[in-house]
UniProtKB/Swiss-Prot annotation:
It is found in: Cell membrane. Its EC number is 1.3.99.-. One of its GO terms (molecular function) is phytoene dehydrogenase activity. GO terms for cellular component: plasma membrane. NCBIfam families: phytoene_desat. The gene is pds. It comes from the Bacteria. Keywords: Carotenoid biosynthesis, Cell membrane, FAD, Flavoprotein, Herbicide resistance, Membrane, NAD, Oxidoreductase. PANTHER family: 15-CIS-PHYTOENE DESATURASE, CHLOROPLASTIC_CHROMOPLASTIC (PTHR42923:SF45), PROTOPORPHYRINOGEN OXIDASE (PTHR42923). Belongs to the carotenoid/retinoid oxidoreductase family. This is Phytoene dehydrogenase. Pathway: Carotenoid biosynthesis; lycopene biosynthesis. Inhibited by the herbicide norflurazon in a non-competitive way. InterPro entries: Amino_oxidase, FAD/NAD-bd_sf, Flavin_amine_oxidase, Phytoene_desaturase, Zeta_carotene_desat/Oxidored.
Length: 472
């Protein structure tokens, strides 16, 4: 059976991969000229890559890690030491670390927290631990139930001191969903904390060794095409065409550069588009179906990713850093963390500006200037003096609608991969799966979509979703 998939991000490509495994013929259509969706990247005139986001692979990403294994590209993940490193704004140029020892979970996480005396006092650690007990004891059902609260509200409910939010969770909230704790659903942070505490290597981080379209998406494309599938770029979906009974008749693809529109048909159809464009594409007869009503409550969150090249090394740290800056979220010196971007003499900082709502409409020059002011606080030793570090060039990548904005109540808006339309399915990290808006969530949604199709139309099975895998 032929299955046409709109969208070549991780959800669409993962869906196609697992459909190919189950004996289907997937045909993936991507509207842009680059693969990857939210992990897309481009090369500039100097041959330097710039990316949509700063992409981190966690040990708590079992389906993503399984995918790397199945593609035989595990060596492309560059694992970092098991730590979480925070800037200390009150002591510019210094860091506070949570180092996880090589012992079983949750003991390793508790030791990491107890050893850190820079950010939290002992009474605060005890209050935080007591506040977390319901989530640890009651598990996922409690975590899901807390979707009615923001993280700030949940912390107040649990009598956790507000300073803990300021010291740790503003940074974590911005890293997970690009918004602040007074907006983000408590479910998001509790889910992350649960995975990090329950799995020995859950919070261990890896960087991809190069640009995602080449190092992750292309192996997926090769895998799909070797098994009879197809992947096409520059194929924007214009309209979902319907039969009289409301099922899908075909995908109308907009012709580019003067070419005529074309209709692509198949036995089954998948949307692996982000939720915002999907909402605009829903045909009128479908709008009363529950899943298409549900998604009206979802919208993508804006985010800005910056790349800044300097004339010297600003840091030797080979890891993700939590800036704890009012403007920025996480950042890394990619000349240290990523093999393809390696440079022993010059830094290339990749930084996430979040929340980005007030900045998405500003010029690149304004954004770079504001970011540079923050960088001077992060690396004062390189900017104070007679010979300050010099910015050589920059790239700013704006995503007005990224992952869905995970405010309270959004869990109820996330649809299943099956729809009320018998030949139409959904994939995307906004669909219901337990890893929320993330690369793992995208891969898992694609796998779950393929599993649903295989269960409905083919006795061959897709490999089961993974719970935990061991990482190096």
């Amino acid at each position: 059976m032929r299955v046409v998939i709109a969208g070549a991000g991780l959800a669409g490509l993962a869906c196609a991969k697992y459909l190919a495994d189950a004996g289907f013929t997937p045909v993936v259509l991507e509207r842009r000229d680059v693969l990857g969706g939210k992990i897309a990247a481009w090369k500039d005139e100097d041959g330097d890559w710039y990316e949509t986001g700063l992409h981190i692979f966690f040990g708590a990403y079992p389906n993503m890690l399984q995918l790397f294994k199945e593609l035989d590209i595990e060596d492309r993940l560059q694992w970092k030491e098991h730590s979480m490193i925070f800037n200390q704004p009150e002591k510019p140029g210094t860091y506070s670390r949570f180092d996880f020892p090589d012992i079983p979970a949750p003991i390793n996480g508790l030791v990491a927290i107890l050893r850190n005396n820079d950010m939290l006092t002992w009474p605060e650690k005890i209050r935080f631990g007591l506040g977390l007990l319901p989530a640890i004891v009651q598990g996922q059902s409690y975590v899901e139930e807390m979707d009615k609260y923001t993280w700030s509200e949940w912390m107040a409910k649990q009598n956790i001191p507000p300073r803990i939010e300021k010291e740790v969770f503003i940074a974590m909230s911005k890293a997970l969903n690009f918004i602040d704790p007074d907006e983000i659903s408590a479910t998001i942070l509790l889910t992350a904390l649960n995975r990090f505490l329950q799995e020995k290597n859950g919070s261990k981080m890896a960087f991809l060794d190069g640009a995602p379209p080449e190092r992750l998406c292309q192996p997926l494309v090769d895998y799909i095409t070797e098994r009879g599938g197809e992947v096409h770029i520059n194929k924007p979906l214009k309209e979902i065409l319907l039969n009289e009974d409301g099922s899908v008749k075909g995908y109308l693809i907009r012709g580019l550069d003067g070419a005529p529109d074309e209709v692509i048909t198949a036995d089954l159809y998948v949307s692996a588009m982000p939720v915002d464009p999907l909402k605009t594409m829903v045909p009128a007869p479908w709008r009363e179906y529950p899943e298409f009503k549900q998604i009206q409550g979802l919208e993508g969150v804006p985010v800005i990713n910056l790349h800044l090249w300097f004339d010297r090394k600003l840091t030797d740290i080979d890891h993700l850093l939590f800036s704890r800056s009012p403007l920025l979220s996480v950042y890394a010196d990619m000349s240290n963390t990523c093999r393809e971007y390696s440079d022993p003499d010059k830094s290339m900082l990749e930084l996430v500006l979040a929340p980005a709502q007030d900045w998405i409409g500003k010029s690149d020059e304004e954004i770079v200037a504001a970011t540079m002011a923050e960088i001077k606080q992060l690396f004062p030793q390189h900017f104070n003096g007679d010979n300050p570090a010099r910015l050589l060039k920059s790239h700013v990548v704006k995503t007005p609608r990224s992952v869905y904005k995970a405010t309270p109540g959004r869990q109820a808006c996330r649809p299943d991969q099956r729809t009320s339309v018998p030949n139409f399915y959904l994939a995307g990290d906004f669909t219901m799966q337990k890893y929320l808006g993330s690369m793992e969530g995208a891969v898992l949604s694609g796998k779950q979509c393929a599993q649903a199709i295989a269960a409905d139309f083919n006795p061959q099975t897709v490999p089961p979703t993974r719970e935990i895998v061991t990482v190096g």
